[in-house]
């Protein structure tokens, strides 16, 4: 079981699609050695030091959190079905309404579109909000994503800078 890293008043909650097998085995988010999440959020400015998956609780010190759309582990995120994503989207809305972070960053455009019945989403800030929480769509940091590290960092940094401008 992989636990959410959540608390009231966070700057951002990063929402992965679902845990991979490495994460399910270790019990930590983004645990596969090829996953670039920890490197990306550090280089984008969310953390002062490069955290390891087993240090995930330290994210709360930086007012960041993690959750996921679907709890079922798979080898690849494309193994998650539409029903699971829609159900996960409804549960995610409840969590975000409870915790009200400044931003929710969903890590994957297709997962966002399916979970929230949206079409034609663009990267970055979305038009919808959950209460006062801005919704962002960022590229998934999985090693299976073809985006370069620099492109990932650039996308995540845009969110970090927007939060700084908002005083968060």
UniProtKB/Swiss-Prot annotation:
Assigned EC number: 3.2.2.28
Pfam families listed in its UniProt record: UDG
GO cellular component annotations of the record: cytoplasm
GO molecular function: DNA binding; pyrimidine-specific mismatch base pair DNA N-glycosylase activity; uracil DNA N-glycosylase activity
Keywords: Cytoplasm, DNA damage, DNA excision, DNA repair, DNA-binding, Hydrolase
Catalytic activity as recorded in UniProt: Specifically hydrolyzes mismatched double-stranded DNA and polynucleotides, releasing free uracil
Gene Ontology annotations of biological process type: base-excision repair, AP site formation
Enzyme class: hydrolase
InterPro entries given in the database record: MUG/TDG (IPR015637), MUG_bact (IPR023502), Uracil-DNA_glycosylase-like (IPR005122), Uracil-DNA_glycosylase-like_sf (IPR036895)
Stated family: Belongs to the uracil-DNA glycosylase (UDG) superfamily. TDG/mug family.
HAMAP family: MUG
Functional note: Excises ethenocytosine and uracil, which can arise by alkylation or deamination of cytosine, respectively, from the corresponding mispairs with guanine in ds-DNA. It is capable of hydrolyzing the carbon-nitrogen bond between the sugar-phosphate backbone of the DNA and the mispaired base. The complementary strand guanine functions in substrate recognition. Required for DNA damage lesion repair in stationary-phase cells.
UniProt subunit comment: Binds DNA as a monomer.
NCBIfam families cross-referenced by the UniProt entry: PRK10201.1
Entry protein name: G/U mismatch-specific DNA glycosylase
Gene name tied to this protein: mug
């Amino acid at each position: 079981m992989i636990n959410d890293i959540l608390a009231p008043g966070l700057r951002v909650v990063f929402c992965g699609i679902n845990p991979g097998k490495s994460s399910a085995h270790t019990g930590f988010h983004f645990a596969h050695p090829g996953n670039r999440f920890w490197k990306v959020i550090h280089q984008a400015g969310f953390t002062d030091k490069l955290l390891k998956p087993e240090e995930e609780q330290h994210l709360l010190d930086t007012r960041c959190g993690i959750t996921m759309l679907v709890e079922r582990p798979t080898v690849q995120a494309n193994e998650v079905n539409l029903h699971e994503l829609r159900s996960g989207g409804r549960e995610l809305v409840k969590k975000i309404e409870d915790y009200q972070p400044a931003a929710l960053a969903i890590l994957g455009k297709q997962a966002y579109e399916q979970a929230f019945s949206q079409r034609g989403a663009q990267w970055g800030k979305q038009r919808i909000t959950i209460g006062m929480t801005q919704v962002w769509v960022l590229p998934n940091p999985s090693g299976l994503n073809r985006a370069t590290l620099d492109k990932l960092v650039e996308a995540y940094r845009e969110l970090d800078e927007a939060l700084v401008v908002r005083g968060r």
